Amino acid sequence: MSSSGAPSRKTLSKIATNRLQKELVEWQMNPPTGFKHKVTDNLQRWIIEVIGAPGTLYANDTYQLQVDFPEHYPMESPQVIFLHPAPLHPHIYSNGHICLDILYDSWSPAMTVSSICISILSMLSSSTEKQRPTDNDRYVKNCKNGRSPKETRWWFHDDKV
């Protein structure tokens, strides 16, 4: 799942480019614990390695996030998905889509890639069981043809897993 669900590629605005360059420099100087940015020449798509926190169900497990930035970032949220294989988690679908409010309705331009990563690691760390969402099969089937998770009407109802 390297590019499925990728938003249409429009050139980043000057504001988005400046913001991402600033975030990348900050990341290089002070990376969030448990994450590694895989260096590429593409500012519009970041691949980030996630390492499960010690003492959690995901301790030492390694996953990859793909972060695709829209033309008008940070006014518009990035698309964030797990690449295959996605972690088994009640809010992470087998196609890598993540049910997390800050990626959609609760997005704020004050958020950064680092704050997204910390929220995802917190979500993983607080999980009490490794399992797929109950509607995983139906959701994934309905996401054929590379539909973006940003096109989904998410229902954020359960923050205790």
Swiss-Prot record:
Reactions listed under catalytic activity: S-ubiquitinyl-[E1 ubiquitin-activating enzyme]-L-cysteine + [E2 ubiquitin-conjugating enzyme]-L-cysteine = [E1 ubiquitin-activating enzyme]-L-cysteine + S-ubiquitinyl-[E2 ubiquitin-conjugating enzyme]-L-cysteine
Instruction: Tell me which InterPro entries the record gives.
Output: Ub_conjugating_enzyme (IPR050113), UBQ-conjugat_E2_core (IPR000608), UBQ-conjugating_AS (IPR023313), UBQ-conjugating_enzyme/RWD (IPR016135)
The family annotation for this protein states:
Belongs to the ubiquitin-conjugating enzyme family.
Q: What EC number(s) does its UniProt record assign?
A: 2.3.2.23
The residue range of the signal peptide is none
Q: Where's the UBC core domain? A: 15-161
Report the protein name in the record.
Probable ubiquitin-conjugating enzyme E2 16
* One GO-annotated biological process of the protein: protein ubiquitination
Q: Which GO terms describe its molecular function?
A: ATP binding; ubiquitin conjugating enzyme activity
Asked if the record carries the keyword Signal, the reply is no
| KW ATP-binding (keyword) present | yes
Gene expressing this chain: UBC16
Keyword line = ATP-binding, Nucleotide-binding, Transferase, Ubl conjugation pathway
Which residues are the active-site ones?
99
Q: Which domain of life is it from?
A: Eukaryota
A Pfam short name: UQ_con
Q: Kindly tell me the pathway this chain contributes to.
A: Protein modification; protein ubiquitination
Summarizing the function annotation, the protein's role is: Accepts the ubiquitin from the E1 complex and catalyzes its covalent attachment to other proteins.
Give the main EC class: transferase
